[in-house]
């Protein structure tokens, strides 16, 4: 039950932050904020899952709440998919493909960067 409460609580924070950022940005191509959020989420998820349990005395429920709840609600694959399909359907194929390439490529690089920083900040025997 503690795990569900942690996930729910952190999901409210992550979803609220995501919506807040979406409201602040008024780019004509609003989907780039989704791309940026997903890239930041990939980086943060790597840090949370690798670094947090080793550096701080937090329970597994908190780590799962932060990763599944906060990062899961902050990032969004469904919005990414919907926005990509909208771009294709409105005839913006190059833009849609650029969005997919940027999201996947930069997301993977952000995850790798999070893993790299985790190994840098942790003693070798802990990683």
Curated annotation (Swiss-Prot):
GO biological process: cellular detoxification of fluoride
Membrane topology (UniProt): Multi-pass membrane protein
Keywords tagged on the record: Cell membrane, Ion channel, Ion transport, Membrane, Metal-binding, Sodium, Transmembrane, Transmembrane helix, Transport
Catalytic activity as recorded in UniProt: fluoride(in) = fluoride(out)
A GO molecular-function descriptor: fluoride channel activity
TM segment ranges: 4-24, 31-51, 62-82, 94-114
Gene Ontology cellular component list: plasma membrane
InterPro entries (UniProt xref): FluC
Annotated compartments: Cell membrane
Means of activity regulation: Na(+) is not transported, but it plays an essential structural role and its presence is essential for fluoride channel function.
Residues that hold Na(+) according to the record: 72, 75
Function recorded in the entry: Fluoride-specific ion channel. Important for reducing fluoride concentration in the cell, thus reducing its toxicity.
The family this protein is said to belong to: Belongs to the fluoride channel Fluc/FEX (TC 1.A.43) family.
Annotated protein name in UniProt: Fluoride-specific ion channel FluC 2
Lineage start: Bacteria, Bacillati, Bacillota, Bacilli, Lactobacillales
């Amino acid at each position: 039950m503690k795990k569900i409460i942690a996930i729910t609580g952190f999901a409210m924070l992550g979803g609220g932050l995501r919506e807040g950022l979406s409201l602040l940005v008024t780019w004509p191509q609003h989907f780039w904020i989704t791309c940026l959020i997903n890239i930041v989420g990939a980086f943060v998820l790597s840090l949370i899952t690798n670094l947090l349990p080793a550096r701080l005395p937090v329970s597994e429920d908190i780590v799962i709440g932060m990763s599944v709840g906060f990062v899961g609600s902050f990032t969004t694959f469904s919005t990414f998919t919907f926005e990509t399909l909208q771009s294709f359907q409105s005839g913006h194929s190059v833009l849609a493909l650029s969005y997919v390439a940027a999201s996947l490529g930069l997301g993977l690089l952000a995850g790798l960067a999070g893993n790299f920083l985790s190994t840098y900040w942790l003693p070798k025997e802990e990683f």
